[in-house]
């Protein structure tokens, strides 16, 4: 365990630095999700690696016998967490965790959700709106684009109350959002 007052890396870098296929796929994901750099991608890969490692360990324990006691509790907690973040469907089991891809984690970032909900035209613009304080969840300003959004929070993502983006005449506001505000 690391010293509590010291920051430690929350990601692992690739094993080999120059693999053309891996680098090309990373660039595509960085562009698609509007990430600032590959470090953000590596963080999501590390989160996914941790989930899958826990699932593998629990499946190995269940191979000896059915999940009982602490193992069953831990498996239920892992599934509950992944279902709460909408990474897995509600009828999923521990085997489904092994089939997860990086995109499942990246889709749950606040930056991606703002773009998917139509509050921004592009993923990069969504990142800018978040860092500039134009986005709120449950009325509270959020300025972290990499925040993982739960299913409940997803319903409450909106423009911050005092943000100039709340005005339908703002030039950077997407047209469909402005039209829905005028109708209300």
UniProtKB/Swiss-Prot annotation:
Cellular component GO terms, alphabetical: small ribosomal subunit
Transmembrane segments: none
Keyword Transport attached: no
One of the GO BP terms on file: translation
This protein's record includes keyword Transferase: no
Keywords from the named record: Ribonucleoprotein, Ribosomal protein, RNA-binding, rRNA-binding
GO MF: rRNA binding; structural constituent of ribosome
Domain of life from the UniProt record: Archaea
Domain S4 RNA-binding: 108-172
Family annotation (Gene3D superfamilies): RNA-binding S4 domain
Region (Disordered): 163-184
InterPro entries per the UniProt record, alphabetical: Ribosomal_uS4, Ribosomal_uS4_arc, Ribosomal_uS4_CS, Ribosomal_uS4_euk/arc, Ribosomal_uS4_N, S4_RNA-bd, S4_RNA-bd_sf
Purpose of the protein: One of the primary rRNA binding proteins, it binds directly to 16S rRNA where it nucleates assembly of the body of the 30S subunit.
Subunit structure: Part of the 30S ribosomal subunit. Contacts protein S5. The interaction surface between S4 and S5 is involved in control of translational fidelity.
PANTHER family found in the cross-reference section: 30S 40S RIBOSOMAL PROTEIN, 40S RIBOSOMAL PROTEIN S9
Family: Belongs to the universal ribosomal protein uS4 family.
Name of protein: Small ribosomal subunit protein uS4
Gene behind the chain: rps4
């Amino acid at each position: 365990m690391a010293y509590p007052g010291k920051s430690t890396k929350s990601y692992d870098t690739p094993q080999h630095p120059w693999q053309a296929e891996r680098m090309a796929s990373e660039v595509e994901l960085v562009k698609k999700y509007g990430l600032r750099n590959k470090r953000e991608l590596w963080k999501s890969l590390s989160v996914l690696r941790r989930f899958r490692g826990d699932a593998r360990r629990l499946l190995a324990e269940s191979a000896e016998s059915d999940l009982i006691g602490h193992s069953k509790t831990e498996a239920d907690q892992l599934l509950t967490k992944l279902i709460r973040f909408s990474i897995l469907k509600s009828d999923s089991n521990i085997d489904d965790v092994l089939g997860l891809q990086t995109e499942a984690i990246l889709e749950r970032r606040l930056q991606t959700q703002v773009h998917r909900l139509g509050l921004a035209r592009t993923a990069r613009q969504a990142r800018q709106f978040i860092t500039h304080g134009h986005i709120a969840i449950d009325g509270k300003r959020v300025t972290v684009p990499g925040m993982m959004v739960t299913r409940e929070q997803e319903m409450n993502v909106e423009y911050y109350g005092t943000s100039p983006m709340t005005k339908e005449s703002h030039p950077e506001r997407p047209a469909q959002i402005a039209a829905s505000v005028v109708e209300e």
